[in-house]
Amino acid sequence: MISKEEILSIYEGYNKEEITIVTVGSHTSLHILKGAKLEGFSTAVITTKDRATPYKRFGVADKYIYVDNFSDISNEEIQKQLIEMNAIIIPHGSFIAYCGLDNLENNFKVPMFGNRQILRWEAERDLEGKLLKESGLRIPKKLNSPDEINCPVMVKFPGARGGRGYFPCSTTEEFWKKVEIFKERGILTDEDVGNAHIEEYVVGTNYCIHYFYSPLKNQVELMGIDSRYESNIDGIVRVPAKDQMELDINPSYVISGNFPVVIRESLLPQVFDMGDKLVAKAEEMVAPGMIGPFCLQSLCNDSLELVVFEMSARIDGGTNSFMNGSAYSCLYSGEPLSMGQRIAKEIKLALELDMMDKILY
């Protein structure tokens, strides 16, 4: 693991007057880059030429770093170019997937906003479950083997895959039947199946809660809440029940979009309590803990209990649903505030206070 001291020593060689905010052109890069520009930073996007159009049309990037493949982002030549432009990387789900956790931990030496150590804790289900459970959050019951399935469960797989390959089932036989279907489609591999995470199926409404923890202010902020459009399950529910049976469609849960939601105000104390507990425990277990944006993906059951089924330890894709601010983020200052701009504000404040060591790794 690259040490924080090594990253900070690289940052010390930067021209602090010419910091460039950089991310990979995907996931949440539009409002990351736009937010940085609104706070006066220079911006750059790492992209392939065939995917540069949105960033040019929206005008969010000052510079373009072209790669043949996104996996090239950890190449020494690209890293050297980033360091020369005084880059601070904002990691998101696609960046982590393309770079790879091992590379990120051991080879990628460009200063990043947040805590790179905690990214493995969101990717590996056992570590994620341990952190959520020890934080005192309600999580779905985990089954250790397909042989234990005797009730409705949800089957998930490691990494940031946007729900691809997830499926529900109720018996061991149904588990293996669906596994074979997804393997035939090229969606799952034997390695995926060996790492399957099987958990209790919680019936409830979906709330993906987006927080920001400021180590400079020692404050957990609620930035917004979204829910997801998932294919093909959201299409299936529009088909009459009798036709669903005849069509015999296997549901999938691939996230194809997000929409903003608000939660009952009486549930907000529970929402803040969950964020506070996770931040406190993360600092204890994976120092320096949650830095900046994170997300708790939850289901609210009919007892109005929020059950957390997943976490993101970095900016989550659902923040795209409030690029011009959310019903919650605007309450802090009365101005529209995206998660991307909130990140940029934290970096700007850290520069002013000479406290970049609190937010970089």
Curated annotation (Swiss-Prot):
Residues bound to ATP: 146-208, 230
PANTHER family: 5-FORMAMINOIMIDAZOLE-4-CARBOXAMIDE-1-(BETA)-D-RIBOFURANOSYL 5'-MONOPHOSPHATE SYNTHETASE, 5-FORMAMINOIMIDAZOLE-4-CARBOXAMIDE-1-(BETA)-D-RIBOFURANOSYL 5'-MONOPHOSPHATE SYNTHETASE-RELATED
InterPro entries with a match to the protein in the record: ATP-grasp (IPR011761), ATP_grasp_subdomain_1 (IPR013815), IMP_biosynth_PurP (IPR023656), IMP_biosynth_PurP_C (IPR009720), IMP_biosynth_PurP_N (IPR010672), PreATP-grasp_dom_sf (IPR016185)
Reaction catalyzed: 5-amino-1-(5-phospho-beta-D-ribosyl)imidazole-4-carboxamide + formate + ATP = 5-formamido-1-(5-phospho-D-ribosyl)imidazole-4-carboxamide + ADP + phosphate
Transmembrane regions: none
Enzyme nomenclature, EC number: 6.3.4.23
Keyword vocabulary terms for this entry: ATP-binding, Ligase, Magnesium, Manganese, Metal-binding, Nucleotide-binding, Purine biosynthesis
Binding site for Mg(2+): Q297, E310
ATP-grasp domain span: 116-348
Cofactor(s) of this protein: Mg(2+); Mn(2+)
One Pfam match: DUF1297
Family the entry assigns: Belongs to the phosphohexose mutase family.
Binding positions for 5-amino-1-(5-phospho-beta-D-ribosyl)imidazole-4-carboxamide per the UniProt entry: H27, S94, N258
One example GO MF annotation: magnesium ion binding
Species name: Methanococcus aeolicus (strain ATCC BAA-1280 / DSM 17508 / OCM 812 / Nankai-3)
Note on cofactor: Binds 1 Mg(2+) or Mn(2+) ion per subunit.
Annotated pathway: Purine metabolism; IMP biosynthesis via de novo pathway; 5-formamido-1-(5-phospho-D-ribosyl)imidazole-4-carboxamide from 5-amino-1-(5-phospho-D-ribosyl)imidazole-4-carboxamide (formate route): step 1/1
GO terms classed as biological process: 'de novo' IMP biosynthetic process
Name assigned to this protein: 5-formaminoimidazole-4-carboxamide-1-(beta)-D-ribofuranosyl 5'-monophosphate synthetase
Function: Catalyzes the ATP- and formate-dependent formylation of 5-aminoimidazole-4-carboxamide-1-beta-d-ribofuranosyl 5'-monophosphate (AICAR) to 5-formaminoimidazole-4-carboxamide-1-beta-d-ribofuranosyl 5'-monophosphate (FAICAR) in the absence of folates.
